[in-house]
Amino acid sequence: MKLYTYLNYGGNCRQAFEFYEQRLGGKITMIQLHGELPASVPRIPGWEDKVLHARMELGDTVLLGADIPTDVFQPMRSAYLTLILETPEETEQLYALLSENGEIFMKLEETFFAKRFGMLRDRFGTSWMLINEKPDVAR
């Protein structure tokens, strides 16, 4: 069994996936647009350039995503994508990149269980936890 995360965006899925590809080292393997739907499938007017389905390989996992109408889109509130990083420096670098123009929930700092731990919502509405675990606590 595999468990993948499917992220919804309020019209900026392509921008989010391109950002994650560039900044996190992912690889977009598919982007299908609403404009590519067969003519027999009902379409949302004006959504030809919006993402119907996207797929990105990121480390050992896969992120999936799509655009949804902005009147139903809400930023993530009850779940976080969690990055477990190898060094404090890598954690600090990615925290700075992801938090730019986003919202910080918990500043990046040392805790009793991690050399670095922080929580944020990025500019695209995706919530993240970044952790550089302490070796004696991680397992």
Where are these regions (language model features)?
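Vicinal oxygen chelate
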Residues: 3, 29-32, 50, 57, ...
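Core segments of cupin and vicinal oxygen chelate
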Residues: 7-60
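Acidic/polar active-site rim loop that often engages polyanionic ligands
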Residues: 77
